[in-house]
C-alpha cells in the first residue's frame, strides 16, 4: 500500500511540475502570387505555409477560365521542407485567367483551404480575392470537445474526491460514485468515437457522407498527425476503461493501489490531447504542449472537484451536522488554489505565444472567446475565494447553492474553451522593420535597423552618431554576431562584417535570420583610435 501511495504522489508531482493554433496554417508566399499577371506560363504552382502541413488531404487544383484542369493532378509536399506544397502545370498554357484552389491540413490538425487567382498576360476582368475557407467555428468539433472536457473533469474530480478529500463512508455515496464514474467513462468514449468522423469530414471538406467513407477515414488515421494521436488516445481509453473495472466492482474508491494504473492512463490521455491543439504548433512547441497539458489537467481537477462536491455531498449539506462536508471542502481548497495558479501560469504563457497583438485579442473570434472564458474564470475564482475563506471558519449553514453556481460557471468555462479551441487562432501581425537606438560612451549612440525583419534576406544597417546626431567618421570596422535565443535557440552563431556605405553608416544583406523567434544581435566595432564598441540588441520576428 505504501509503495502504491508513493507511485501516485510521484505521478501527481510530475503532472504539476512546470517544465520546460498558433494558428491554423496560412500562406506565407506563393508562386504565382495572388492576383499576379505573368508574362509567360509558369512551370508549377508553389505555396509556402507558415507551418508544416500534413501528408493527408492536400491538393492544389488549377483551373482556366473554362473550368478545365490545367495541372498534372500530382500535388507534392517537399520532402526537405514540409512547409511547401507544389503541383506541376501542363506545358505551354495560353494567356488566360487561372485560379489555384488549394487544401491542406495544418500541423494542429485543422483543415484549411483557399484560392489564389492569377493570369498569364493581362487580365481583362477583375480578380476575386484570395479566401480562406473553414475559418469559422466548426459546431461539431466544439460540441465534441465540450463533451470531452466535461467527461474528463467529472472523472478526475470523482476519483480525487475519494482519494484525497472525502474521509467518510456512505452506501448511497458509493452508488452515486459508480454512476458518475460509469457515465464519465461512457461520455469520454463517445467523445473520442465522434472525434474521428468529425475530423474526417472537416479534412475531406464534404458532407457527412464523406465522414464515413473508408478511404477518407484511412487517410485521416494514417496520413495526418491528428489521426495518429487519435489511435493513441483510443488505446489509452481502452486501457483506462479496463483498469477502472476492478475498482468500481469492488467499490475500492479510496485505494491508491486500485487507482494508480487508471490515473496513469488518464493523464496519458490528457497529454495526447495537448498534442492536437494550437499549443502544439507554437514556436516553443515543447513548452506549448506541456503548458496545454498542465492547463487542461488543472482545469479538470478544479471544475471536476467542484462537480464532485456538488453531486456527492448533496445530502451531507442537508444534515444538521455539516462537519464532514466542511472538512471535505477544506481539504479540496488547497488543491483548487494550486490548480488556479497553474491555470493562470499556463494560460498566460500559451496566450503569449498565440495572441501576438491587442488587436488580435479584441477583434478576432478567437480573442473574443478567450476574453469570455477569462471573464467566466474570474467569476468562478471569486466564488472559489469565498468558499476558501468560509472553510477557515466552519459554519452551521451550507454552501451547496454557491457550489452549484461555481460548478455551473465551470461548465460554461469548459464549453467556452471547447468553442475557442475550435476556432482558428489569430494570424501573426504583419512584420515591421526593426529599428532601435542605444547609447554608448561619450554621448554617442548606435542605431540598428533590420528590414524587412522576417526570415530570409534582410538588410542590416547600423549608424554611429555623436551627441549632436552627426555621424562618427573614425569607425574602422563593424561586425555583427546573430544568434537565436529561447528554449529552442541554437548555440550556432553567424558573424559577418558590414560594409561602410557612407561615413558612419554601415550596411549589408544577410540570411542569418532564417526563422521566426527571438534573436540577439551583438555589435562589435573598432574605432580609429582603437577603442571598441560592444553593444547588444534583441529583436523578435
Swiss-Prot record:
Record's signal peptide? 1-25
GO molecular function ontology, one term from the record: copper ion binding
A single BP term in Gene Ontology: copper ion transport
A GO-annotated cellular component: periplasmic space
Q: What happens when the gene is disrupted?
A: Cells lacking this gene show a growth-defective phenotype under copper deprivation as well as a reduced intracellular content of copper.
Q: Does the keyword Membrane apply?
A: yes
Q: Where in the cell is it found?
A: Cell membrane
**Which Pfam families does this entry report, sorted A to Z?**
CopC, CopD
Could you say which residues bind Cu cation here?
Answer: 24, 110
Does the keyword Cell membrane belong to this entry? yes
Matching entries from InterPro entries are given as: CopC/D (IPR032694), CopC_dom (IPR007348), Cu-R_CopD_dom (IPR008457), Cu-Rt/internalin_Ig-like (IPR014755), Ig_E-set (IPR014756)
Q: What's this chain's function?
A: Involved in uptake of extracellular oxidized copper under copper-limiting conditions.
Check the record and name the PANTHER family matching this protein.
INNER MEMBRANE PROTEIN YEBZ
Task: Quote the protein name from its UniProt record.
Answer: Copper transport protein CutJ
Q: What species is this protein from?
A: Bacillus subtilis (strain 168)
* Gene expressing this chain: cutJ
Amino acid at each position: 500500500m505504501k509503495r502504491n501511495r508513493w507511485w501516485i504522489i510521484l505521478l501527481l508531482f510530475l503532472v504539476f511540475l512546470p517544465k520546460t493554433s498558433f494558428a491554423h496554417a496560412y500562406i506565407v508566399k506563393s508562386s504565382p502570387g495572388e492576383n499576379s499577371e505573368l508574362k509567360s506560363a509558369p512551370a508549377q504552382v508553389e505555396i509556402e505555409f507558415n507551418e508544416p502541413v500534413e501528408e493527408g488531404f492536400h491538393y492544389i487544383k488549377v483551373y482556366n477560365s473554362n473550368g478545365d484542369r490545367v495541372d498534372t493532378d500530382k500535388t507534392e509536399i517537399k520532402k526537405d521542407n514540409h512547409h511547401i506544397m507544389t503541383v506541376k502545370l501542363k506545358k505551354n498554357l495560353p494567356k488566360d485567367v487561372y485560379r489555384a484552389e488549394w487544401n491542406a491540413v495544418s500541423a494542429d490538425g485543422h483543415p484549411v483551404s483557399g484560392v489564389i487567382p492569377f493570369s498569364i498576360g493581362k487580365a481583362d476582368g477583375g480578380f476575386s480575392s484570395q479566401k480562406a475557407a473553414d475559418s469559422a467555428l466548426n459546431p461539431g468539433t466544439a460540441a465534441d470537445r465540450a463533451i470531452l472536457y466535461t467527461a474528463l473533469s467529472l472523472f478526475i474530480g470523482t476519483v480525487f474526491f475519494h482519494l484525497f478529500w472525502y474521509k467518510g463512508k456512505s452506501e448511497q455515496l458509493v452508488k452515486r460514485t459508480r454512476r458518475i464514474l460509469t457515465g464519465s467513462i461512457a461520455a469520454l468514449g463517445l467523445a473520442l468515437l465522434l472525434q474521428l468522423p468529425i475530423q474526417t469530414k472537416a479534412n475531406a471538406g464534404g458532407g457527412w457522407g464523406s465522414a464515413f467513407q473508408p478511404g477518407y477515414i484511412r487517410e485521416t488515421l494514417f496520413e495526418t498527425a491528428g489521426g495518429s494521436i487519435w489511435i493513441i488516445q483510443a488505446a489509452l481509453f481502452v486501457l483506462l476503461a479496463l483498469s477502472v473495472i476492478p475498482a468500481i466492482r469492488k467499490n475500492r474508491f479510496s485505494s491508491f493501489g486500485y487507482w494508480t494504473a487508471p490515473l496513469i492512463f488518464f493523464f496519458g490521455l490528457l497529454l495526447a490531447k495537448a498534442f492536437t491543439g494550437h499549443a502544439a504548433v507554437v514556436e516553443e512547441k515543447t513548452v506549448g504542449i506541456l503548458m496545454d497539458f498542465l492547463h487542461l489537467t488543472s482545469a479538470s481537477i478544479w471544475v471536476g472537484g467542484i462537480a464532485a462536491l456538488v453531486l456527492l455531498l448533496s445530502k451531507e449539506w442537508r444534515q444538521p451536522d455539516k462537519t464532514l462536508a466542511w472538512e471535505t471542502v477544506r481539504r479540496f481548497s488547497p488543491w483548487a488554489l494550486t490548480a488556479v495558479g497553474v491555470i493562470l501560469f499556463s494560460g498566460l504563457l500559451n496566450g503569449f505565444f498565440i495572441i501576438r497583438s491587442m488587436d488580435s485579442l479584441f477583434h478576432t473570434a478567437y480573442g473574443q472567446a478567450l476574453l469570455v472564458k477569462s471573464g467566466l474564470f474570474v467569476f468562478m475564482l471569486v466564488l472559489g475565494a469565498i468558499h476558501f475563506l468560509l472553510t477557515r471558519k466552519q459554519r452551521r449553514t451550507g454552501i451547496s447553492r454557491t457550489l452549484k453556481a461555481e460548478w455551473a460557471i465551470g461548465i460554461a468555462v469548459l464549453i467556452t474553451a471547447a468553442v475557442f479551441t475550435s476556432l482558428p487562432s489569430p494570424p501573426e501581425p504583419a512584420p515591421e522593420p526593426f529599428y532601435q537606438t542605444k547609447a554608448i560612451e561619450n554621448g554617442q549612440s548606435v542605431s540598428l535597423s533590420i528590414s524587412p525583419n522576417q526570415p530570409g534576406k534582410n538588410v542590416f544597417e547600423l549608424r554611429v552618431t555623436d551627441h549632436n546626431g552627426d555621424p562618427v567618421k573614425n569607425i574602422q570596422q563593424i561586425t555583427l554576431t546573430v544568434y537565436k535565443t529561447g528554449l529552442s535557440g541554437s548555440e550556432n552563431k553567424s558573424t559577418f562584417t558590414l560594409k561602410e556605405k557612407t561615413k558612419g553608416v554601415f550596411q549589408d544583406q544577410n540570411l542569418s535570420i532564417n526563422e521566426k523567434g527571438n534573436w540577439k544581435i551583438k555589435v562589435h566595432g573598432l574605432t580609429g583610435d582603437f577603442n571598441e564598441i560592444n553593444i547588444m540588441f534583441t529583436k523578435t520576428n
